[in-house]
């Protein structure tokens, strides 16, 4: 189910401590659901808004993971984006907000729905420029190379690339 681009990114970053050889929701007691210092730069502040808090969580936007097996790059210095989730990176001032409100930002972002005449938040973090490169073409499309916008209609924009090829990008809600 694709609700919005932020939810799509969260689906890609979801981590569970369950599975074969893993824990269950019942065995995840309070002390096991806490954020450990060793999670910094790997596991984000985002959590499920249910009994799965701490059992199902999310990676940070730029986790210090060095391979597909999940090995941690202990020798790498983390990035600023790697400290929080995608929603944390999008929410202006999240580091200065109440922790409960900051955590709820993730849940709230998953429920956002596009509509006509909405006004985007005027306070930005710059991370919104990264989102287009991380989501599927359902939400955004990155140009294939240098080119020029040659036509804009109500439904799409047309780009003519330097090599002469033409591509059409849909606009708005479909």
Regions found by a protein language model. Give the residues of each.
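Long, charge-dense accessory insertions within large macromolecular proteins
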Residues: 1-174
